[in-house]
């Protein structure tokens, strides 16, 4: 058996050791980022501009270290890959400790900053300004976001990994573009009951209406993503 093979154990041990070292390196990197952010805040405070500056802190993606049997990796549509920190400090508009559960995407940053600067985002700008979310008035906001990865001819080990996914406040559907037939390898998760995405509901009959709606909504999001 595989786990009894000395060569297999040697290979697995080397992968584990490499992963542990990468975790340590990433921890050091984050500590360095934290120090850098602190230095920026110190300079702004000394110049008297700290509370007059909108500071947005976010990550471009998450990372896997064993979740879903992956790691180190970041390209998949599971929560560890697509859900990342998004923090804003701007005392003029945002009270400290405010938390929002609305679905944001990185494309929302540009129109937000344009509006903060007194401008009006043009029709070619993707994303939406998040400033309306900071008001106390009810706001009609997006109900789902699109996540996708195009892997063909990128790296040999990633061929066939192209996917398009839709995430709502509760569900996620991952459609593997070049795997299986008629979406038989697609994945559907109830993030409320299964936050770690361990139970694929794609073939669950009770969830068939949800699956079909998500498929339709995914097509609409892809169509709206001009050029993608």
Go through each PLM region and give its residues:
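C-terminal cap/loop subdomain of S1 sulfatases and analogous C-terminal strand-loop tails that border
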Residues: 61-67, 102, 107-110, 115-191, ...
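A general structural motif at alpha-helix termini
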Residues: 134, 202-205
């Amino acid at each position: 058996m595989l786990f009894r093979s000395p060569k297999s154990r040697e290979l697995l041990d080397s992968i584990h050791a490499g992963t542990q070292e990468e975790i340590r390196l990433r921890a050091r990197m984050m500590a360095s980022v934290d120090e850098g952010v602190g230095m920026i805040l110190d300079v702004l405070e000394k110049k008297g501009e700290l509370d007059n500056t909108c500071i947005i802190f976010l990550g471009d993606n998450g990372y896997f270290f064993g979740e879903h049997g992956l790691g180190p990796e970041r390209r998949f549509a599971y929560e560890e890959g697509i859900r990342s920190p998004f923090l804003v400090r701007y005392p003029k508009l945002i009270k400290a400790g405010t938390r929002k559960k609305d679905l944001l995407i990185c494309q929302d940053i540009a129109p937000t900053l344009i509006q903060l600067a007194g401008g009006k985002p043009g029709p070619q700008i993707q994303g939406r300004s998040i400033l309306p979310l900071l008001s106390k008035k009810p706001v009609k906001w997006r109900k789902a976001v699109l996540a996708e990865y195009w892997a063909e001819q990128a790296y040999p080990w990633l061929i066939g990994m192209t996917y398009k996914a839709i995430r709502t406040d509760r569900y996620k559907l991952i459609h593997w573009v070049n795997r299986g037939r008629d979406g038989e390898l697609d994945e559907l998760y109830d993030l409320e009951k299964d936050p770690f995405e361990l139970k694929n509901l794609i073939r669950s009959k009770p969830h068939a209406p949800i699956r079909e709606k998500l498929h339709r909504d995914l097509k609409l999001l892809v169509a709206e993503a001009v050029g993608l």
